From Swiss-Prot:
<keyword id="KW-0368">Histidine biosynthesis</keyword>
<dbReference type="InterPro" id="IPR020568">
    <property type="entry name" value="Ribosomal_Su5_D2-typ_SF"/>
</dbReference>
<keyword id="KW-0028">Amino-acid biosynthesis</keyword>
<dbReference type="Pfam" id="PF00475">
    <property type="entry name" value="IGPD"/>
</dbReference>
<keyword id="KW-0963">Cytoplasm</keyword>
<dbReference type="GO" id="GO:0004424">
    <property type="term" value="F:imidazoleglycerol-phosphate dehydratase activity"/>
</dbReference>
<dbReference type="GO" id="GO:0000105">
    <property type="term" value="P:L-histidine biosynthetic process"/>
</dbReference>
<dbReference type="InterPro" id="IPR000807">
    <property type="entry name" value="ImidazoleglycerolP_deHydtase"/>
</dbReference>
<comment type="similarity">
    <text>Belongs to the imidazoleglycerol-phosphate dehydratase family.</text>
</comment>
<protein>
    <recommendedName>
        <fullName>Imidazoleglycerol-phosphate dehydratase</fullName>
        <ecNumber>4.2.1.19</ecNumber>
    </recommendedName>
</protein>
<comment type="pathway">
    <text>Amino-acid biosynthesis; L-histidine biosynthesis; L-histidine from 5-phospho-alpha-D-ribose 1-diphosphate: step 6/9.</text>
</comment>
<dbReference type="GO" id="GO:0005737">
    <property type="term" value="C:cytoplasm"/>
</dbReference>
<keyword id="KW-0456">Lyase</keyword>
<dbReference type="InterPro" id="IPR038494">
    <property type="entry name" value="IGPD_sf"/>
</dbReference>
<dbReference type="InterPro" id="IPR020565">
    <property type="entry name" value="ImidazoleglycerP_deHydtase_CS"/>
</dbReference>
Amino acid sequence: MRTGAVSRKTKETEIEVAVDLDGRGTAHISTGIGFFDHMLEQLARHSLIDMTIKAKGDLHIDDHHTVEDTGIALGQAVRQALGDRAGITRYADVLLPMDETLTRVAVDVSGRPYLVFRTHFLRDKIGTFDTELVREFFQAFTTHLGANIHVETLYGENAHHISESSFKGLARALRVALTLDPRQLGEIPSTKGVL
């Protein structure tokens, strides 16, 4: 079983995350931030990673700490579930359309964290959600998973569509990259012999 569970408690947030990489995309998400819950549900559904995420944060200040700390805990849980990463496909990329928006996402689950985020929003908010927090989530998730992730919106106008295509693009790329390759089961997908 490729599962991981992380509890993270700070003075700002309390986060509990559990994942099953070989799931069916079932999501039980509660962060107190409606739009963010919707994005995380898309991430679970389209990656086929079962996710349970319960977060309580200092939302009376703003959403930043809750979004960032959820990204940290989710990245750590997926990293834990991967173990030594033996047998994974490792690389994947996807072009994800959503109405007028097209986003490209490429991932290398290498153990080396690096985010390239070339996505720009024409609005500062989606409802009450700050659009700058999309990047904050991706940065935290990338760093704590230990992956190289590139997100680039080629074109688009609607902020909701840009955000959702980024999350769905990540999901579809992870769905491939985290899949076990039957031709290299038990093998580390690197000439170094370690990731």
